[in-house]
Amino acid sequence: MRMEKTTDKPLSAGDMNDEYSRGPIDDIDCLNFFERAVQDPCCEACDTEDADEELRAKLSSFNFQPDSSPCNAKCQQTLNPLCKIDEALPAESELAPSRNGSVSEANSDTNSIASTVHDPVDSKYGGMPSLRKAKTTSYFTSSSSNNTTMRNPLKKCNTNINGLLVNGRSSSSSRQSIPELFSGACTKKKNNVLLKSETPNSEFSSNSLQHCNSRSFSLPRSRSRSSAIAIPTHLYGLEKYVSPELDTLTADPEESIERFSNNRPREISSCCPNDTGDTSSSLSHSNTSSSLNFPLGTNTNQFHQPRQPVQQQQSSKPNFGAGRKKSFIEMSLASSFAG
């Protein structure tokens, strides 16, 4: 016998479409799904199309007429198929007993849920099923949990603030404990820096005492003044520029000034002769307004500050910079005013 060799002919486009159309159902579904996703990937209807078809199928197969069977009461309490499954899950979770509760509490919950379900074919609702949304449980089941969650951050904030206050008091860089308030003071010390002011009146000192006593955040007298407001000199290395006599002025300024004037002899020199009195007043003002307090013994310059007579110094306000030499800045200011 003679075997004939079969040759495969190329298929036309119509034959290929027929073969694809006669293919299995899974291939067609995959092809349709692929084409749908490629043609319109941003369409939201593509994602919900299958769900809509399932919902229509459930509605078509749902029996809206009540049955006369004894299980009719149970069937009436079932959820409507229009409700989504994920919404019905929290309501079903209420049927299970809680960790701390008992089975009787769970049964009472089911009775309360069943009492809220109405007959879908009642005459009050027009004989149509009511589209009821299933009840969902809140995240916090009791008010005590809400109170505890609100109190915890408050406790954390309070502990953090108290810790900062304690650390600030312990790390204060004062070398001598000073009283909190003193009357008749004409100087203020903020972390080893003197701020000069005019001599206060008796009324002003009493008002300042009352105002400072009324403050709730004032430190006790035994402790030193906190450095939260002033500039910390120990951080910037400014302690070497501060005179050691500042500590003696902090306890009682008036007594320390008298002691300083008695221990250290003062040199009385006449002021430079000048035609106008404005330059002398500007010189004294520039000398008293300088904020640099160099320690004693620094040989910055041999030129001494012009001082007033002893009688005028006792009558006027005390001069704290009388015992030190003039700096280069003060000399340059004096020469600029004199010229």
UniProtKB/Swiss-Prot annotation:
Signal sequence annotation: none
Protein location: Mitochondrion
Keyword annotations of the record: Mitochondrion, Phosphoprotein, Stress response
Phosphothreonine: residues bearing it: 159
Main location: mitochondrion
Example of a GO cellular component annotation carried by this entry: mitochondrion
Annotated segments matching region Disordered: 1-20, 94-156, 198-224, 258-325
Residues modified as Phosphoserine: 177, 224, 227
InterPro entries, per the entry: Mbr1
Compositionally skewed regions (Polar residues) per UniProt: 99-115, 198-213
Function according to Swiss-Prot or TrEMBL: Participates in mitochondrial biogenesis and stress response.
Name of this chain's protein: Mitochondrial biogenesis regulation protein 1
